[in-house]
């Protein structure tokens, strides 16, 4: 998988407030949002505040000009260069194959797409659930006793720790998955946009997260059962 997953998860708008000259520049049309509209995306937008989106401003999707612009501003210069090269290559292949009738992906290709998307999400689900259980249990047995917080509050704090850890561990999970030797599925641009490919990709992610979360429950083996719960209730 590419490095786009953690960026999509925490993408921010790092654009600066434009000056008077930039504010007077015309805004790009709404149809130039992806791929073939890269030149329009580079044009400055209207005045925007520094930092993340305001509370009342909805987060734009990547199929809009504003959403694509925010995503581009969140990337480093090397990542933008790599993304631009891949977009040009992808669009050139799509234009060359535009007049050709693309065949639907074969069952073998769909199976490969499924596996390629499932493996990284097994790692994500495993780490997320395991860290949440361990952190939530320790919070309940330490801070929970002192502050008298409930089990659900301790679980919520454990989930916070798990999410923070996931931001830093996402890159390592992707690097480990790439070392398994699974290359990007060999599909044409038209085959990538077909519904069969998208369904296979989403199913792979869903199954991967499910398997990872089930495997991530292994810390429960090392924690006690009813006796520890009774002792905790007596202490509270």
Curated annotation (Swiss-Prot):
GO biological process: cardiac conduction; cardiac ventricle development; regulation of cardiac conduction
Entry's localization field: Cell membrane; Mitochondrion inner membrane
Cytoplasmic side: 58-106, 162-205
Extracellular-facing ranges: 128-138, 227-236
Record flagged with keyword 4Fe-4S: no
Transit peptide: 1-57
Keywords from the named record: Cell membrane, Membrane, Mitochondrion, Mitochondrion inner membrane, Transit peptide, Transmembrane, Transmembrane helix
Membrane-topology annotation of the record: Multi-pass membrane protein
Regions crossing the membrane: 107-127, 139-161, 206-226
Example of a GO cellular component annotation carried by this entry: plasma membrane
InterPro entries: TMEM65
Subunit annotation: Monomer. Homodimer. Interacts with GJA1. Interacts weakly with DSP. Interacts with SCN1B.
PANTHER family in UniProt: TRANSMEMBRANE PROTEIN 65
Role according to the record: Essential for maintaining proper cardiac intercalated disk (ICD) structure and function as well as cardiac conduction velocity in the heart. Its association with SCN1B is required for stabilizing the perinexus in the ICD and for localization of GJA1 and SCN5A to the ICD. May regulate the function of the gap junction protein GJA1 and may contribute to the stability and proper localization of GJA1 to cardiac intercalated disk thereby regulating gap junction communication. Regulates mitochondrial respiration and mitochondrial DNA copy number maintenance.
Protein name per UniProt: Transmembrane protein 65
UniProt source species: Bos taurus
Lineage: Eukaryota, Metazoa, Chordata, Craniata, Vertebrata
């Amino acid at each position: 998988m590419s490095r786009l997953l953690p960026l999509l998860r925490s993408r921010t708008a790092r654009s600066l407030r434009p000056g008077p000259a930039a504010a007077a520049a015309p805004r790009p049309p709404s149809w130039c949002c992806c791929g073939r509209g890269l030149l329009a995306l580079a044009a400055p937008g209207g005045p925007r505040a520094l930092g993340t989106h305001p509370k009342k401003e909805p987060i734009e999707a990547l199929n809009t000009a504003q959403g694509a612009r925010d995503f581009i501003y969140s990337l480093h210069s090397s990542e933008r260069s790599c993304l631009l090269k891949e977009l040009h290559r992808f669009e050139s292949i799509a234009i060359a194959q535009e007049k050709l009738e693309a065949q639907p992906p074969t069952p073998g290709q769909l199976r490969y797409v499924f596996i390629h998307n499932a493996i990284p999400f097994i790692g994500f689900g495993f780490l997320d659930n395991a860290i949440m259980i361990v952190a939530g249990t320790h919070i309940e047995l330490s801070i929970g006793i002192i502050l008298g917080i409930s089990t659900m509050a301790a679980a919520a704090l454990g989930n916070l720790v798990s999410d923070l850890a996931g931001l830093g561990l996402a890159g390592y999970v992707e690097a480990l998955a790439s070392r398994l030797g699974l290359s990007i599925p060999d599909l044409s641009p038209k085959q990538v946009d077909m519904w069969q490919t998208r369904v296979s990709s989403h199913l792979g992610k869903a199954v991967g997260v499910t398997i990872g979360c089930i495997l991530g429950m292994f810390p429960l083996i090392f924690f006690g059962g009813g006796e520890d719960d009774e002792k905790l209730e007596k202490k509270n």
